[in-house]
Design a protein with these regions (language model features):
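Extracytoplasmic and endomembrane cell-envelope/extracellular-matrix remodeling and assembly machinery
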Residues: 33, 44-52, 63, 75, ...
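Catalytic Zn2+-binding segment of zinc metalloproteases
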Residues: 137, 147-164
């Protein structure tokens, strides 16, 4: 089940203006925090001055910004990839120091090499990283670096640095940082409007942040049993690959990569004993899924990519390559070819969720819903709370026109996972399929609007749902109560711009 099946939200040019909603509500700051930064001068690491913003306030800004990202960026809602990236991220977080907030990891459908962290423990990764990171440790090195930015509160520190030189409100300071993170070109334009002295201070601050994030990131990699050499290796390969490029990757504008930084990271990594880290089958499968469905590569070219690697691959690597080719076959409705590739895979690993998910797509494509439901029910007996399996099961019920069964499952799911837009999208579809639950359909869609910070639309939907519900019913009372919550959330969201 891919993002396409789950109504993946792609930001249009008009909706991208929402990405500046906090930076629009927030953006009068002339100084960008993380752009074109190549030199250094930072306050002592142990004396991080963060009086400008509390951890609680960081969480508020992080929640607001995440809602805007959902509205403006092509977030990958693929349950398998979300499970993988969050599992990997939380393995790193469990081995990090100074963790003050829960972490959330998200994937953006963008082939550019980039990653960024923002307030509230959010770390965003571009799907293009999977195309360039050859091992899980290399991907983990980027994530560990971003986690360090969060644990060391580099955004809050940068705001403190700006506050010492610019008479700006907290909201405006946040706006300049958010603008630089989400749209480096806009951040650069803002930076050019600043005075030379302010810009130099910001440049100095950022380079030291990068050095600190590298140092702490390598420590986290080591504690989490990853290959610490992966960080300098990945940096070095990127630098070599783009040495003579006319246009540098976006990653370099937000993460400057001078030779000294590569040398320093290599020296730090050498302080740890060498370790042979086995190939991660899950990383290989996640990478194959990215290539097949989120790489921007034409189907024929993606198939060629898999076939070229298949010739020299180990037996373990061939599994992930066959899986990727099977996904291409399913998406092209070559169901017989897909079955030939998938059958031996799922026979060897019947509980592998990558293979279960692919077989579900195949069965749905052939309208063999009972086969898919039987396999999913068996898998759920072993893993009753797994979100990938639950969403696949609900999706299959919707496609099989068993809307009432899907509603029963999805009402529980959305209660447990209210921030998962996949659950609300499927619940909306399930209500719609019955033709008798227009109020529920409107409410589910309203939750999707709320997750994107589109409060007026969410309130409109819930108002209509309350009007459709039976007068005095429990459903109407529930809708009215949710309306009150949404109005309070909208007021808090708006209040961020007034600080």
């Amino acid at each position: 089940m891919s993002s396409r099946a789950l109504g993946s939200h792609k930001g249009s040019k008009a909706r991208r203006l929402l990405c500046y909603a906090l930076a629009g509500v927030l953006a009068s700051a002339p100084v960008s925090a993380r752009v074109e930064s190549y030199q250094s001068d930072l306050p002592d690491i142990g004396t991080a001055a963060v009086s400008t913003l509390s951890v609680a306030k960081e969480k508020e800004f992080g929640d607001a910004y995440m809602r805007m990202l959902r509205a403006s960026k092509p977030i990958i809602s693929d349950p398998l990839l979300n499970e993988y990236i969050n599992g990997l991220g939380h393995r790193l977080v469990a081995n990090a120091n100074d963790v003050r907030t829960p972490f959330r990891f998200i994937l953006i459908d963008n082939q550019a090499i980039n990653a960024f962290a923002f307030f509230g423990g959010y770390v965003a990764m571009h799907s293009g990283l999977f195309l360039h990171a050859k091992t899980e440790s290399e991907l983990a090195s980027v994530m560990a670096h971003e986690i360090a930015h969060v644990t060391q509160r580099h955004l809050a520190r940068s705001m403190e640095e700006q506050a010492q030189t610019s008479p700006l409100t907290v909201a405006a300071l946040v706006g300049s940082l958010m603008l630089a993170i989400a749209a480096p070109e806009a951040g650069i334009a803002a930076a050019h409007a600043a005075t030379a002295g302010s810009m130099q201070n910001q440049i100095n601050f950022t380079r030291r942040n990068e050095e600190e994030a590298d140092r702490i990131g390598i420590e986290t990699l080591a504690r989490a049993d990853f290959d610490v050499q992966a960080m300098p290796r990945f940096f070095s390969r990127l630098a070599d690959e783009y040495r003579y490029a006319s246009q540098m990757p976006e990653y370099f504008s937000t993460h400057p990569l001078p030779a000294s930084r590569i040398t320093d990271s290599r020296a730090r990594a050498r302080q740890y004993p060498q370790k042979r880290v086995p190939v991660s089958p899950d990383y290989q499968l996640a990478r194959a899924r990215i290539v097949a469905r989120y790489s921007g590569i034409a189907s024929r070219s993606a198939m060629d990519w898999f076939e070229r690697r298949h010739k020299e691959a180990s037996p373990a690597e061939k599994q992930s390559l066959n899986y990727g080719m099977a996904l291409l076959d399913i998406d092209a409705r070559r169901f017989d070819d897909a079955r030939k590739k998938l059958t031996p895979l799922i026979k060897a690993q019947p509980n592998n969720r990558f293979f279960i998910d692919a077989m579900t797509d195949l069965n749905i494509g052939e309208k063999h819903y009972d086969k898919a439901l039987s396999r999913l029910k068996q898998a759920l007996n072993h893993q009753p709370n797994n979100r990938v399996l639950l969403l696949n099961h609900a999706y299959t019920l919707v496609k099989a026109k068993r809307g009432d069964d899907a509603i029963s499952m999805l009402e529980r799911y959305t209660h447990q996972h209210p921030d998962d837009s996949n659950g609300w999208f499927l619940l909306q579809q399930a209500y719609e399929s019955t033709g008798t639950h227009r109020d529920g359909e409107l409410a589910a869609q309203g939750e999707r609007y709320a997750l994107r910070g589109q409060w007026d639309k969410a309130i409109r939907n819930y108002t209509q749902a309350a009007q459709l519900a039976e007068l005095g019913s429990l459903a109407q009372a529930r809708y009215d109560a949710r309306l009150d919550q949404l109005r309070r959330q909208q007021a808090r969201f708006k209040a961020l711009s007034d600080r």
